[in-house]
Amino acid sequence: MAKTLVAYFSASGVTRNAAELVARAAGADLYEICPAESYTAADLNWRDKTSRSSREMRDKNSRPALADHPVNLQEYDTVLLGFPIWWYTAPTIINTFLESHNFAGKTIILFATSGGSGFGNTAQDLKRSVASSAVIREGRLLNGRLQESAIREWLSELGI
């Protein structure tokens, strides 16, 4: 039987709420991608060019360290991967997560939260961080008032 994991990164809690709803609707396990050093409000100030998030997103080779709480991906076929959109793509900690695990042969379906921007080239950007046999599919932006019934319909369309 195929097993699904919802893995997510949330700096402010918005993506956490969406991920919890997706996991509940999918009957999936939930895993939080945690940075070794939590983000503060100052770190997330996108208007400040010297803020931590601004520096990380400017440097495409930035790979923020993960907190030490591993997940065993071998038991999962599908990973629903959630994150906020930062600068029209995934935060670089998502690359850290992808590069820290073996996703060969797995399907990764993206979902994101955003204050206004879309996925852009996110799927293509992240493909560079996984084995060539991994499939990355752009999913949905989950913004505003989320309804579990709408999430279930989306998951059903995906075959989950």
Model features per residue range: what roles?
Residues 1-81, 88-90, 95-99, 132, ...:
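N-terminal beta1-alpha1-beta2 submodule of the flavodoxin-like/Rossmannoid cofactor-binding fold
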Residues 109-146:
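Short, glycine-/small-residue-rich phosphate/pyrophosphate-handling segment
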Residues 102:
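Short aromatic/basic micro-patch
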Residues 83-84, 112:
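Conserved strand-to-loop "acid loop" that flanks and positions the catalytic carboxylate
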